Structures are given as C-alpha cells and as structure tokens.
Curated annotation (Swiss-Prot):
This is Probable splicing factor YJU2B. The gene is yju2b. Transmembrane segments: none annotated. One of its GO terms (biological process) is RNA splicing. Coiled coil: none annotated. It is found in: Nucleus. Residues 354-390 are annotated as: Disordered.
Length: 390
C-alpha cells in the first residue's frame, strides 16, 4: 500500500517529512514487504539459484543446477574488503536445510552443510582460463620486491606469447567497426545477386515454357556442361541415307515369289538386320537351317495297278538334293529355282508320256489330264474319276 501510494505521489495531509522521513515510514512498512520480516536480525530473503549440481543429504535426491529457492541471505564475514554471504534454504523434497556461502578467493560457492557437491570441476590452466591470484601470492607481490620483479618478467613473457592472438582479435574487430560501410556492401551484394537470380529464373521459365515442363529446374553447374559436351543426340543415319538404302533393297529383291515362304521369311528378317553386308551368307544359313525347303509334288500314273487306291503316288523332291542345286552359290537363288523347275518339268513329261502309252485307251483322257497337270508344280485334285490320295 505504501509503495503504491508513494509511486502515485499521493501524501496524506498529516504527513511530515521531518517526522516520518518517507511515505513508508508514515505507514510503518518496508519496501520489500515480507522479504524484510527478519531484517532486524540481519537476514534478507532472496531468490537463490543453485550454482551447480548437488545431492541432498536428507533425501539423497539429485538437485540440478539452476533450481531456485527462497533463501535467507546473511553476511558472515569479509575476504579483505569483499563480504562473504551465507544462504540457508529448505530442500523442496524433504525437511532438510542446505547452507552455502560465497568464496571470493576462488570465485566459487562452498557447501557448508546439508548437501554434497557433484564434482564436475576442471583445471582452469588446462582450459586456458583466467587464473585467480592466490592470497599468499598477493602478499608476496606486495611485500617482496624481488618476487615482484620475477613475476613481472613472467607476465611479459605471457604478453609476448599472446601478442599474435591479440593482434588477430583486433584486426577482426576493426573489420566490423564501420557499420555504415558494412551495411552498404551487404546491400550492394544483395542487389547484384538479386539481378542474377531474376535472370536465371527468366531463362528457366522460358525453357520450361518451350519444353512444356512443370517441374522446377536445378541450377546449372560446370560438371553438367562438361557431361553435356560429351553427349551427342543425333540419328546414326540421315533420311537420305535411309531412303537410298531402301531403294537398294528393293532393286536387289527377286522379281519372282519364292516357293518357300517360311524360309524366305527367316531369310528376310536376317537380311533386314544385316543390311547389305553378308547377304549371301545369311541366305545360305537360312536355307541350311530349314528342314522342308522347296517341296515339289509330282503326280504319276501307275502302270500295273488300275485300282482306285493305287492310282497315283506322290513324291517330294527337296531342292538341296537335286543335281542342279549342287556346286552353286546361295546368292543365285532365283536361277537355281528356275533350273530345278525346268528339269522337273522334263522328267514329269517323260514319265507321264510312258504311262500314257502303256495304259489302255479308256484311260487316255485321264492320262492327258495328268500330262497337262504334271507340268505344274502343284498337284491337281479336281479330277473326280480318279480316287488317288496324296
């Protein structure tokens, strides 16, 4: 109440500065209120934060660094002119009280009672930290001139060893001294990079629009340029070359249909794969791999038997067993087929003529029909009188 009224600059009518001194004296209150209830004993209640990890002696629980307590602060002594304060607080997990006090000589806190410290200290010299001067050493420096002179020489050696680090720190600090110049350089760099980014984005959008891509493009790198220079995206044969090759294939093709369609199909697929090279070898391989090449049916008339079952017979003559097909090249396929057809027709004519002379006159018409049909490479089954089977 006194604080609020004092802040609001309100003073009662009977307030006398000489008598009361302040508004708190008028209301007989302290500005710290409940925290100053033991001020007459020299104790002030403060918020104390645990400086390191400890274990409570009462409940044996761990209390972490940074936990805050309402502690009683009291002055218990001096280290030279520096006061030593003691803090007394109650554990929040049990009824045990913990007492700690400051140690100005080591710049640390010391546990007086009620807890044990978790040892996590390290050597300050190994960590290259600033070492505090011991009390005995301070006394020697103040009383012993020779010791002070020797200590001054050691200090100069330390300074000489630390000069490079100090110069580096000063140079680094001087580089950030002019804030306006640094800000101008940063904004200038940002404007330049912004223009470059805008140009790259415009180029990427043009490429995406031209190619119809909807995915973002990654930035171009030197490795990508080298890899792209090594690749070639072009057809091995131009349109004119393909057209000329097609015309050569058509001009070299046979005018007559080949009787062996199966063998011709296999040979044609090989010719398309191999092209103009090895054409003769491919045809020879296709002909040798086929088991039924150029079958020829020949219809003959029997001399002795006149029965319907033994009226005719069929003979299959492969091309590769014919005498005309020997000692020839596979590339002369059309001429081979023509020679074989001529020789076969001659044999058929002679055979059918002898059969016609030996048969009876009642079968002359059939023999004439057989002679007429024998000249063809395909058997004629249109004769209804003959019941021959092929």
């Amino acid at each position: 109440m006194g604080e609020r009224k004092g802040v609001n600059k309100w003073y009662p009518p009977d307030f006398d500065p000489a008598k009361h001194g302040s508004i708190n004296g008028y209301y007989k209150t302290h500005p710290l209120r409940e925290r100053a209830r033991k001020l007459s004993q020299g104790i002030l209640i403060i918020r104390f934060e645990m400086p390191y990890n400890i274990w409570c002696d009462g409940c044996k629980n761990h209390i972490g660094m940074g936990v805050r307590y309402n502690a009683e602060k009291k002055k218990v002594g001096n280290y030279y002119t520096t006061p030593i304060y003691r803090f007394r607080m109650k554990c929040h997990l049990c009824v045990n009280y913990i007492e700690m006090q400051t140690d100005p000589a080591t710049c640390d806190y010391v546990i007086v009672s009620g807890a044990q410290r978790k040892e996590e200290r390290w050597d300050m010299a190994e960590n290259e930290q600033i070492l505090t001067t011991e009390r005995n050493e301070k006394e020697k420096l103040e009383t012993d001139a020779m010791y002070k002179l020797d200590h001054g020489g050691k200090d100069k050696e330390k300074l000489r060893a630390a000069i490079p680090s100090l110069n580096e720190l000063q140079e680094h600090q001087s580089g950030w001294k002019d804030d306006f110049q640094l800000n101008s350089a940063l904004r200038r760099k940002f404007r330049t990079e912004k223009k470059v980014i805008a140009e790259e984005e415009e180029k990427d959008n043009a490429v995406r629009l031209r190619t119809g891509l909807s995915i973002p493009l990654v930035p171009e790198r030197e490795e990508d340029k080298k890899l792209a220079s090594l690749l070639t995206f072009q057809s091995p044969d131009s349109y004119e070359d393909k057209k000329q090759w097609k015309r050569q294939e058509i001009s070299s093709r046979s005018w007559f249909n080949s009787p062996s369609s199966a063998a011709g199909g296999a040979a044609g697929s090989l010719l398309q794969k191999l092209g103009q090279q090895g054409r003769g070898a491919a045809v020879a391989k296709a002909l040798s791999s086929s088991t039924s090449t150029l079958p020829i049916l020949v219809r003959r008339k029997s001399e002795s038997s006149k029965s319907e079952t033994n009226n005719t017979m069929s003979t299959i003559l492969p091309v590769d067993t014919h005498p005309a097909a020997k000692d020839t090249d596979a590339t002369d396929l059309p001429s081979i087929v023509n020679n074989i057809n001529v020789s076969i027709n001659t044999d058929i004519n002679s055979c059918t003529t002898d059969a016609c002379k030996a048969s009876s006159s009642s079968e002359e018409e059939n023999s004439i029909d057989s002679c007429a049909t024998g000249k063809s490479l395909v058997a004629d089954y249109s004769d209804s009188d003959s019941g021959s089977e092929v």
